[in-house]
Every structure is written in C-alpha cells, then in structure tokens.
C-alpha cells in the first residue's frame, strides 16, 4: 500500500507527515534518483502556488534534488499547467508543482510531471515510494546539482496559452471578471486576457501567503457572481489555487460548471470537425444531463473514475481531445498535457465571440437532472465494507434503477465518503443520499 502518493501526488497538512520539509527533501532525493537516466545533464523545473509553506517545501525539494546531482530551475508562483509546459519546453527530466490546488492555505502538496509533461504513471510513483524509504544515493562533491531562478517563465507560459487561439480571434469589447483565487495565476491570467483585448476586472490577485482560495476562486464563486453583475460584465471566470480548473459565471450571475463547458466545447468542435474520438471523456460525477445532451448530438460520453489523471488516461487510450470534470478540470489535449483553466477559458471565450450571443444563452447547453452530493467524514476503518452500508447502497441502486445513477466513493485527498445520486425525481434522489449517509455515519 502506498504511504505518500494519493490520487493527485502527495498532499497533506503543512508540517505534518507527509508535508514536512524532511519528507519533501527525501522526495527530491528519491524522484531525482529515479529520473537520473542517461549521461546528459539532468534538470528539474520547480514551481509553486502562493501558500506560505511553499517557500519551505521548495527549499527542501531543491536540497533533495541537488544532493543527488540534479540541476534545479526555480520559476516561482506559476499555474500547474505552466510547469507541465515548461518541463517539456526546457527538455527537463522532471517537473514539480508545489500546491494543494483548491484546498486552504494550511494544506500543501507535491505534484510530479515526467519529461513529456504528463503526470507520472503509477509505476513511476511506486518506484519513488520505494526509494523514499531506502538510503539515498547521494552525488559526490563534484557532481552536486546547481539551482537557478529564471525570470521569463511567466512570459513563456502566457505566449504558449495565447497560441492556442487562432491569430484572428480577439476579445475586444468583452468585459471579463477574472478571479485568480489569490493563487498561482494571479500574475499571468489577467495578462493573457488583457493582451487579447479584453477589459479585465481582476479579483483574487493579492496573495499574502494565507488567503489562497479564501472566499474566492472556483470553489467559492459568490464574490465573482456579485462582481459580474455589479460591473455589468459579459462573463466571469474563476480559477482555483493552482489554476488547473475553472468555473464560469454568465452575465446574470448564474454558475456554469464543467459539465456545461464540456458540452459546449464538445458539440462545437464536433460541428467544426475538430473533435476526436467521437465524444467527450468525463468522470462518474458528471451529470446525466450531459450524457443525454451529447447523445442528442450524436456523440458519446465516456466515464472514468474521479480524477483528472483517469480522464487523461482514457483520452490517450481512445484518441479523445476533450475531457474534464464537473468541478472544472478541462483537458484539451490538442493544446496541453493536463488541465488548464486559463487555456480552457480562452476556448470558451472564442465560442462566445463567434456566437455573438449572451453567455446566459450560449453556455447553458442542457438542463441538468437533479443531483445531490453529500460528504460524510470518518476517522478510520472501512465504512464502505459495513453490512448495513452495503444494504443501504443496494436499496438506493434499486430505487434509482433506470431513472438515475448512484456513486459512492472515498475521497482521494481527505477522510471523507462522498455520496452522490442523481435522477429525474429530486425527492427520491435526496431520500437515497440521506439513507446512505445515515448508514455510513452509523458505521463510523
């Protein structure tokens, strides 16, 4: 069983194992040793979001990587997809992003990317886990790595993201409210939209180390909704702490989630002959309404386990180029190797410009069926193996059979059991979710 790696790298509470300086240094040693392949000069790119603990973890990782003979390029606060892009662009052996995504500042995490810009495979993560508990293979004094900061990384990323749009597409005349969650994109995303001609109202762009995702960003869109309406904006865009996801708000203040965005881009790209794979890849959490909408367009919805890495794996296997999650992760593999909120927003805005219709008309592609998600916290044990819980799940599945879906799973990042049900009958959906949640609480 893995001790450190979860569904999205290594994550935890700062200064508690595994998110300590000591563990971070050993991660640098282990990952560095694993990727010391060939006789070229080895290099790792390290970026971070704006959490206070990022400084501590960055220095620990630098010490670990250089101690085994790897050079380090430090790029400072940058979106997660920027690290993936820079890793490929700089021909680095490895990329590291220090972030806990949408979590509060007390948490932090370490995400690793291979030289191809994709998140590491299960096999690579397992190999690094093994090396973490072994005696590190340190370089001799003449082969210790060097660390260097570069100042133009932000400009490289901004240029690459803008290149995803055709040269003739401009955002002139659009007023956009952009919420950067006081996170990694605070100094890149506003520039992207401004350089393309938009009138940008930026919020969440004053990070202080402890205000990342604090009442702002994609998981707390109330401020964005209020600002869009108050400023008379055409659209609002909220990124999360590491800018790999987005949530959109139309000019009336209504929220558009990842399902609606996937539906719009998938259907539009299909009409343009740009869609690959004959459909869209999403997770088991995406709304049944999206599936029905795509079927009506002659497209299919491929479902995976929760997590953008599972979405990307299926996209690569099936030759798809559009995938994502209801939470706002958008993977557009013609342009990026991982989810990129800024890039996805540009593709969405290109559709808005071309349609010449209000966001409230264009972005509501379908009516979602009633869906309810509740979380039950547990301290330990295996509540999903409890007989009463299993009986409640079976009863819920029988009740929704043919009229909805039921998904019960443990969170990959927190001690939670997530219970989701959806169907045409909102009352029945709520009854099923509450019944299963009660059974889980009784079991723990």
UniProtKB/Swiss-Prot annotation:
Question: Where on this chain does Mg(2+) bind?
Answer: 101, 240, 242, 244
Q: What positions constitute the catalytic site?
A: 101 (phosphoserine intermediate)
Q: What is its EC number?
A: 5.4.2.10
GO CC annotations, alphabetized: cytosol
Q: How is it modified after translation?
A: Activated by phosphorylation.
* Residues where Phosphoserine is found: 101
CDD domains the UniProt entry points to: GlmM
Q: Give the cofactor note text.
A: Binds 1 Mg(2+) ion per subunit.
User: Which reaction does this enzyme catalyse, per its entry?
Assistant: alpha-D-glucosamine 1-phosphate = D-glucosamine 6-phosphate
**What are its cofactors?**
Mg(2+)
Q: Which Pfam families match?
A: PGM_PMM_I, PGM_PMM_II, PGM_PMM_III, PGM_PMM_IV
The text of the family note is: Belongs to the phosphohexose mutase family.
Identification of the protein by name: Phosphoglucosamine mutase
Q: Which organism is it from?
A: Sphingopyxis alaskensis (strain DSM 13593 / LMG 18877 / RB2256) (Sphingomonas alaskensis)
- Classification of source organism: Bacteria, Pseudomonadati, Pseudomonadota, Alphaproteobacteria, Sphingomonadales
